[in-house]
From Swiss-Prot:
Protein name per Swiss-Prot or TrEMBL: Cytochrome P450 monooxygenase 67
Record-level Gene Ontology MF annotations: heme binding; iron ion binding; monooxygenase activity; oxidoreductase activity, acting on paired donors, with incorporation or reduction of molecular oxygen
Keyword Iron in record: yes
Pathway terms, separated by semicolons: Secondary metabolite biosynthesis
EC number, UniProt record: 1.-.-.-
Residues the record lists as binding heme: 447
Record-linked Pfam families: p450
Keywords: Heme, Iron, Membrane, Metal-binding, Monooxygenase, Oxidoreductase, Transmembrane, Transmembrane helix
PANTHER family on file: CYTOCHROME P450 (PTHR46300:SF5), P450, PUTATIVE (EUROFUNG)-RELATED-RELATED (PTHR46300)
Compartments where located: Membrane
Length: 515
């Protein structure tokens, strides 16, 4: 059968192209109809679900919603699609197994454009520059050979921590900050810390305090309404620019000062091996350093210092809070260390496998108060389908790590601090219940410093328990003051300020600390 009209080849190609586009559009709309969005609470026009999310402890309302809508929920914040993952399985299925699609990062306007946290891997979109930073971290933080080189500084700083806790127990939180900062500054810059008043530790602490004070509301509004960046400082709501300028000034110092010290030491031939010298030397192999190269090295070094410091401090302060509330845990862990290690030396990293109860204590610290309760959001690159539900490309993906750490199917009586929950489990059950599989994130954006952080925390915990008694302080009438197990709402979940009494267990422990 002949067509009544003969089409020229170019015209025929155009007609076929239009027809193909129409078929594709029909298929796409049918796909949208046959694959509904994940369930979630009803949204309002314009606002979406923004009015339903509290500024304080949003992870808790997400956890409540998950009981109704399941482990994968869809929200809309203004015009932005947001996927809340309340299930470990969903987080692993999407971010671990579909990393090519789920490893991007949403625009974090306050952090990148106002605070100038850049170029830093945690704010970068998934791409070549991100891979470059990741390669630097992997070489320095994820191989056993590299991690072994840090044992000496970890050993030294834990001994310094013990002495400081005994001499100034009332300032234990400052000593924890010094301990954490000292390890990271030595590893990142070859910078030796001799005091809690170290300039770089003070600078980092001040910068993080100022950044947190800017508030999550400003961050949310800027991310969804970037035009707010253009309002003047004097305009109502423009105060974030003044606060941002202070943070930016402090961040500039953190980027420049330690890096310049390292460069100067290298020029003088007195540079110490550290992450920054490694990155400089590695980059020099590819030619002269460009200004972009220098900026990237500064950003990679600074990120490891500030991010590693804040989360490690949180875990150690959570440990102290748990121990003052649960002296029976301290006594049980002390008995294990005494039996395995003895009283003539301090426990070391080589003892870790022989101290299972101590490892349970640390697992429970991570689970009881995950340092970053909602993780750092990912972004979906392209449309996807999961369990028959449509996931729009460009959606922000938030992992509710806090809720995952309280999954009743895995953790009975989840609000209770109870290291014994990990006893008597099969290898599969132990792997499934280990909170370290969730607290450091998921997929290709898994925290690269997790092994260093975990070993530093373990060594500090082991040596504190081996040598010190942690007790409640007493008031003027001699009554014990029991601290509250409460945590500050925010990107990082710090325990609310509390007091405790720290003393050597006995004369044997005091001598070990003094050595």
């Amino acid at each position: 059968m002949q067509l009544p009209v003969q089409l020229s080849p170019p015209l025929a190609l155009a007609v076929l192209s239009i027809a193909a586009c129409q078929i594709a559009l029909v298929w796409w709309f049918q796909r949208k109809r046959t694959n509904p969005l994940p369930p979630g609470p009803s949204a309002l026009p314009f606002l979406g679900n923004a009015h339903q999310i509290p500024l304080q402890y949003p992870e808790r309302i997400f956890s409540q919603w998950a009981r109704t809508y399941g482990g994968v929920m869809y929200l809309r914040l203004f015009k932005k699609s947001v996927l809340i993952l309340d299930s470990v399985k969903a987080a692993q299925d999407l971010m671990d197994k579909r990393g090519a699609k789920f490893s991007d990062r949403p625009q974090l306007t306050l952090i990148t454009d106002v605070f100038a946290f850049k170029p830093m891997m945690f704010t970068m979109p998934y791409g070549d520059l991100w891979r470059r930073h990741r390669k630097w971290y992997q070489a320095s933080l994820e191989s056993k050979a590299a991690l072994d080189t840090y044992n000496a500084v970890q050993e030294t700083e834990t001994c310094t921590l013990l002495s400081a806790l005994v001499s100034e127990p009332e300032h234990f939180a400052d000593q924890v900050k010094r301990f954490t900062g000292a390890i990271l500054l030595e590893i990142v810059y070859g910078h030796a810390v001799t005091s809690v008043k170290d300039d770089l530790i003070r600078l980092s602490d001040e910068m993080m305090t100022q950044a947190v004070s800017a508030g999550s509301l400003v961050a949310t509004l800027l991310d969804f309404f970037p035009f707010l960046m253009h309002i003047p400082e004097w305009f109502p709501g423009g105060g974030f620019k003044r606060e941002g300028a202070r943070v930016r000034h402090l961040m500039r110092q953190l980027l420049d000062v330690p890096f310049n010290e390292v460069q100067q030491a290298m020029l003088e031939g007195s540079g110490k091996a550290c992450l920054t010298t490694y990155m400089l030397e590695e980059q020099a192999e590819h030619g002269d350093l460009t200004p972009d190269d220098v900026d990237n090295i500064k950003g990679a070094a600074t990120l490891l210092f500030i991010a590693g410091t804040d989360t490690t401090i949180t875990s150690l302060l959570t440990f102290f809070l748990a121990m003052v509330l649960h002296p029976e845990v301290v006594h049980k862990a002390q008995a294990e260390i005494d039996r395995v290690v003895g009283r003539t030396r301090l426990p070391g990293l080589m003892d870790r496998d022989a101290l299972p109860y101590l490892d349970q204590v640390l697992k429970e610290v991570y689970r009881w108060n995950p340092p970053v309760p909602l993780g750092i959001p990912h972004q979906v690159r392209d449309d996807d389908v999961y369990n028959g539900r449509h996931i729009p490309g460009g959606s922000m993906v938030v992992s509710n790590i806090w809720s995952m750490s309280r999954d009743p199917d895995t953790y009975e009586d989840a609000d209770r601090f109870w290291p014994e929950r990990y006893e008597g489990k099969s290898p599969d059950e132990l792997a499934r219940s280990d909170p370290r599989r969730i607290v450091y994130g998921f997929g290709r954006r898994l925290c690269p410093g997790r092994f260093l952080a975990d070993s530093s925390i373990w060594l500090a915990v082991a040596r504190v328990i081996a040598t010190l008694d942690i007790r409640k302080v007493r008031d003027a009438e001699g009554k014990e003051i029991t601290p509250s197990a409460e945590f500050i709402s925010g990107a990082v979940s710090h325990p609310k300020p509390f007091s405790l009494d720290i003393r050597p267990r006995d004369e044997v422990a005091a001598k070990l600390i003094a050595q």
